[in-house]
Every structure is written in C-alpha cells, then in structure tokens.
Amino acid sequence: MKRKLIVTADGSHSFYLEEMDEHYHSKHGSIAESNHIFIEAGLKQKSAEKSNFKLLEVGMGTALNVWLSALALKGSGLKVNYTAIEAFPLSLDEAQNLNYPDLLGKGHALFNKIHQSEWELPVQLTEEISLLKQQASLQSLSLEQAYDLVYFDAFAPEKQPELWEESIFRKLYDSMTKGGLLVTYCVKGVIRRRLKAIGFEVEKLAGPPGGKREMLRARKV
C-alpha cells in the first residue's frame, strides 16, 4: 500500500492512501481527533466505570490511539488488556517518521515500543496496558474475549464498506460485555440504524474541535 505522509491542521502527521483516496485521520488534526473520540469519549468514560477492562481497536493504523491511551492511563492504577487489529501494518520506517512524540514532547520510547513489539504476542507495554497486536482483518478473526470498550477506527464506509455491515457490528456486539462501549467518528444515519437494530443504545456526541460536528458512542444494553 502506497502511503503519503501529510501534516494535519494541529501539526500532527497522518497518512494519505492514494489508491483509496483516503486519509488515516481527520485533516483537521490527527491528535485532536483521536483524543476527543477515543480517549475522552471512550477510554475516560470506561475508566470511570471499571478499573480492569478489555479494549479492542479495529484499525490500529499509526498506533496513535494505542499511544495516547497509554499516556492517558499512566499512573492511574488501572489495568487494560488492549487488542489492536490491523490488516496492513506500517513499516518501521514509516512509523519512525511520525511526529507525535516530538509534537507532544513525550512518549518517544513508548511509541517505539508499540511499533517494535512482535505481532500475535502479548507484551506488557506499560504498568497499565498489556498489548496484543494482531495482523488480520476483523472478518477473519474469532473474537473470544469479552470486550468492555471498542475503538472502531476503520476507513470511511464509502471506502471500506465491508467493515460497516450489520454482520460486523453483530460480531462486535456479541463479543462485548453488557454495558460495553463502542466509539467511532462516523455518524451516518445508516450506521446508527444498524447499531440500533442489533441492540446498541446509540448517542451522538459533539465532534472534535474544528472537525466533524458529531461522533457516535454506542452502548451494549
């Protein structure tokens, strides 16, 4: 896959995938988007509910969400089993070109550890996070864990429609605990209806600064 490194509005890097005409993050700010949708609306909400939980990320991409999650949990005393799925991982060279640690002035060794860790083997990333990276498509995986939180960060429905089908959300729903949360940037009506049809309680929240007006958070009830 041919990826072009770009700079988003908040100064943080992302990639543009030419063959799909798709960006890995919002052009309005990679870090701003990830912090708002996945950390604030997802991780912090679940952290207030449970001190020990399992997290699934669909679409690890640049590992920005993994890194920001680890930074947010530092010193919290929480324990999180984090599974990150990615079908087309970055090369180490691509990862090392990303400016997230330089931009925030911290987390350099942590970011490198995420990308240098082996695939398919659990690693104790920090005191709080045990990380398992899996190189696979969501469709091919058997989800055996009971996840309390899902970061759904696939490419847009019009670019990767197979990951937004009702069958995919059913698979996720069945793998989640009661009260489990799913957060995503997409608020399209058809996606909301699919989530509701399966049994999720769906709410629209304010979107990230300068980016999309709204985001979605769904809870298994």
Describe the predicted segments one by one.
Residues 1-53, 70-100, 104:
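Rossmann-like AdoMet
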Residues 58:
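Conserved beta-strand/loop positions that form the S-adenosyl-L-methionine
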Residues 62-67:
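Glycine-rich SAM-binding Motif I of class I
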Residues 94-144:
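S-adenosyl-L-methionine
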Residues 148-162:
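A short SAM/SAH-binding and catalytic strip from SAM-dependent methyltransferases
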Residues 149-151, 178-186:
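Conserved beta-strand signature within the Rossmann-like core of class I S-adenosyl-L-methionine
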Residues 162-178:
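A short glycine-rich, Lys/Arg-flanked "PGG" loop and its adjoining helix->strand segment in the class I
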Residues 198-221:
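Core SAM-dependent methyltransferase catalytic element
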